[in-house]
C-alpha cells in the first residue's frame, strides 16, 4: 500500500493542482506522488535529524501527513479512480494496440528486474552495503536517526555524523519503509525498491520518447526499446547511469540519476514550452526537495539542469521571465546547499 496506492493518490492531488493535460495520466500520478513522498520526508527528516529526535517520532509525523493526504485524495477521487481501473486496468487492454518494439522492451525490462531481484541480492557493491543498508537497519533497530557508526556499532554525536547523511534522507526513508512494512531494510533495498525504481525509470524514458516524438507513439516505443537494449551493455563502470539502475537502484545517487534528473528533464521541457503556472512551479520545487533527499550532488546538478533548460527555452521563445521562475524553483536546493556551506565554514573556518 505504502509504495503502490499512496503515491498514486498523492500524485492525483498534484495533478489536480497543475491542471495540465500531460499530467492527467496514472503513470505521471505515480511518479509525481513518489517524488512528493520523498520531498515531504526530506522536509521533515532533516530538522528532526539535526534536533536528534527519535526515529519513532519521525515515523509518526510522516505517517500522519501521508494518511491525511491519502484520505483527501480518496475522498475526492475514489470514484474516478475506480472507473479508470475498470476501464483501463484489464490485462487484455493494457497490452493492446502497441508495436512489436514495445513488447520486446517489456520483455527486456522484466528480464532486468528479475535478474536484479533474484540474482543480485548477494552482491555487495564495495562498502555501500555497509553504509546504505546497515545505516537504514541501525536507524530502524536503535530508534536513532543515523547516529550509529555502521562499521563499529558505536553511537555517534550529531556533530560526528557526516553532512551527507544529515542533509539527505533517502537512507532513513528505507528505514521508514522497513518499519512500516515489518520487512528488513535489506529486503526493502534489494528486493522491493528495485522493482519500483526500474519500473519508474523506464516509464520516464517512455515519456521522454513521447517528448522527442510527439506525433508518433511508434517512434517513442522504438526509443524505449533502444534504451532497454543499451542498458544491457552500459553497466561497465560505477560512474554510468546504467550501473546505478542495474546494480544498486536502492542508493540515493541512483534515485537522483535514474528518477529525479530524467523527470526534471521531462517536466522542465513541458512547463517551459507553454505558459508557466503556479502548480508547475510547485511541482518543480517538490522535485528539487526530492533531489535533495537523494544525494548532496543533486544540490548542484538538479538546479544546473533546470536552469539550462530554462535558458534554452527563454532564448527560443524570447521570454526571459522563465529564468526568474526557474530560479525560484531552485530555492529548495539552495537552502540545503547553504546549510552545507555554512556547516563546512563553521567546522573548518573557526566561526
PLM regions and their residue ranges:
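Membrane-embedded, hydrophobic transmembrane alpha-helices
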Residues: 1-95, 322, 334-350
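Specific aromatic-rich, kink-prone transmembrane helix
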Residues: 6-11, 250-273
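Transmembrane-helix signature of membrane-embedded glycosylation machinery that interfaces
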Residues: 14, 18, 47, 205-215, ...
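Membrane-interfacial loop-to-transmembrane alpha-helix junctions, especially the N-terminal start
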Residues: 20-37, 101-102, 218-224, 277-284, ...
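Transmembrane signal-anchor helices characteristic of membrane glycosylation enzymes that use polyprenol
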Residues: 99-127, 228, 329-343
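Active-site lumenal/periplasmic loops and adjacent helix-entry segments of GT-C-fold
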Residues: 111-231, 242-250, 259
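Membrane-interface alpha helices of multi-pass inner-membrane proteins
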Residues: 280-296
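Perimembrane helix-loop-helix junctions
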Residues: 302-327
Amino acid at each position: 500500500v505504502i509504495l503502490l496506492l499512496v503515491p498514486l493518490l498523492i500524485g492525483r492531488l498534484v495533478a489536480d493542482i497543475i491542471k495540465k493535460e500531460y499530467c492527467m495520466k496514472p503513470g505521471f500520478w505515480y511518479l509525481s506522488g513518489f517524488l512528493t513522498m520523498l520531498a515531504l520526508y526530506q522536509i521533515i527528516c532533516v530538522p528532526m535529524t539535526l534536533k536528534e529526535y527519535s526515529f519513532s517520532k519521525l515515523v509518526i509525523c510522516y505517517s500522519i501527513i501521508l494518511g491525511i493526504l491519502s484520505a483527501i485524495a480518496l475522498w475526492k477521487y475514489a470514484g474516478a479512480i475506480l472507473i479508470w481501473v475498470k476501464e483501463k486496468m484489464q490485462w487484455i487492454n493494457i497490452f493492446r494496440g502497441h508495436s512489436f518494439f514495445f513488447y520486446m522492451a517489456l520483455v527486456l525490462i522484466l528480464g532486468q528486474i528479475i535478474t536484479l531481484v533474484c540474482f543480485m541480492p548477494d552482491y555487495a557493491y564495495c562498502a555501500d552495503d555497509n553504509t546504505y543498508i546497515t545505516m537504514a537497519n541501525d536507524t530502524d533497530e536503535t530508534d536513532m536517526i543515523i547516529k550509529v557508526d555502521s562499521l563499529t556499532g558505536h553511537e555517534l554525536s550529531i556533530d560526528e555524523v557526516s553532512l551527507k547523511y544529515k542533509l539527505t534522507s533517502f537512507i532513513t526513508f528505507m528505514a521508514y519503509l522497513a518499519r512500516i512494512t515489518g520487512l528488513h531494510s535489506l529486503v526493502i533495498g534489494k528486493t522491493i525498491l528495485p522493482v519500483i525504481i526500474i519500473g519508474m525509470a523506464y516509464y520516464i524514458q517512455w515519456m521522454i520518447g513521447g517528448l522527442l516524438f510527439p506525433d508518433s507513439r511508434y517512434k517513442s516505443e522504438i526509443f524505449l526499446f533502444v534504451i532497454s537494449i543499451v542498458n544491457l551493455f552500459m553497466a561497465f563502470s560505477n560512474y554510468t547511469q546504467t550501473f546505478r539502475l542495474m546494480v544498486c537502484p536502492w542508493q540515493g545517487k541512483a534515485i537522483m540519476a535514474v528518477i529525479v534528473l530524467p523527470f526534471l528533464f521531462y517536466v522542465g521541457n513541458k512547463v517551459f514550452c507553454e505558459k508557466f503556472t503556479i502548480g508547475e512551479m510547485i511541482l518543480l520545487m517538490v522535485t528539487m526537495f526530492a533531489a535533495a533527499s537523494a544525494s548532496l550532488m543533486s544540490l548542484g546538478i538538479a538546479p544546473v539542469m533546470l536552469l539550462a533548460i530554462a535558458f534554452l527555452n527563454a532564448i527560443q521563445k524570447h521570454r526571459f521571465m522563465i529564468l526568474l521562475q526557474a530560479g525560484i524553483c531552485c530555492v529548495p536546493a539552495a537552502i540545503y546547499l547553504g546549510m552545507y556551506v555554512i556547516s563546512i565554514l563553521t567546522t573548518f573556518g573557526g566561526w
